[in-house]
Amino acid sequence: MIRRERPELGIVLSFFSPSGYEVRKNYPVADIVCYLPFDTASNARRWVETINPEMAIFVKYEFWGNYLEQLKKKDIPTYLISAIFRKSQSFFQWWGGTFRHMLGCYSKLYVQDEASARLLAGINVHNVDVTGDTRFDRVTDICRTTHEIAQMEALKNTGKKIIVFGSSWKADEQLYADWLRSHTDICGVIAPHEFDNCRLQKLKEEFTTKQGDTILLSELTSITDTADIYKCTKQLKCIIVDSFGQLASLYRYGDIAYIGGGFGHGIHNINEAAVYGIPVIFGPKHQKFKEATDLINCGGGFEVSGKTQLESILNTLISDEKTLYTSGKAAGSYIARNIGATPAIFKSIFDI
């Protein structure tokens, strides 16, 4: 939105993790896309002096003490958007003075919900607006602009149910591998969160069965002849996604989405799938993500704690069209109800 409404401004987009950087390293909206150097005093000082920003915007959990200190020292307006706070966080403990000091470096904090605003008020942080989560706007924009993939359209037309396993880890695959292999009328799209050639090859071998082939997405999309596409998709069992940046476009072809990470450090982006009006399934480690609880409560999301529960939910969804439809509709409606944070924050920051 900044690029569209304020095209004269330069935009530097930084990431700390490879998973974010790899997806956006060629992002045309930003003038510079780069990694953020480690949060040391010297790195922060050099970074701020080199970039010399007019303002800085951090997202959700971006609390980098040295960077915040340098930005405040230079009187650079600094904002935190889509933030969400929990009582268990360090800011709200008796020993959390250093962390509370970080909050004082922000010019304003834009939080997702009233509960976060109340927690902050309890420690005398009042420069707070409740605006919601910008990720709802982002996934809605992606949904509206995703490109069609002809080979996936052909797969959809075969009548097979398609389940997208997004940001999948080995712990996730251990839960759904047997079920997926045993259901000949299901095609799986597996997008591993991290991969190399060895991991991709192992996934191909693991999910190829006598009833169907498993191929890489790049192999599928390289087929351009209509007859060859039809022949390939008719006998497909599984597609392994072997490039970054494709997952958000692939969810549109799914009937169900399983989002990985819930048996590790925490679930990945479930809104990317829910926006397409399909039910989302995920593991138990989702406490940091308000949208997971909200989706469970509205009937659009399902938490699973193990293999048996996952298989039960998958069996219900693929065998009961009414449940599949109502769950998907609930997920899509939840996303639609929560859009609007981005324009609200933009108007506030730029005083429109």
Where are these regions (language model features)?
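Active-site and donor-binding regions of nucleotide-sugar-utilizing enzymes
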Residues: 1-145, 164, 168-170, 183, ...
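Nucleotide-activated donor-binding/catalytic signature segment of Leloir-type glycosyltransferases, i.e.
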Residues: 24, 28-32, 203-241
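Conserved catalytic-core segment of nucleotide-activated headgroup transferases in glycan assembly
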Residues: 1-7, 148-220
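Hydrophobic beta-strand scaffold residues
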Residues: 76-78, 214, 280
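Catalytic binding pocket for nucleotide-activated donors in carbohydrate/polymer assembly enzymes
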Residues: 106, 122, 247-333, 348
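Acidic donor-binding loop of glycosyltransferase active sites
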Residues: 51-55, 230-265
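C-terminal alpha-helical cap of glycosyltransferases
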Residues: 338-352
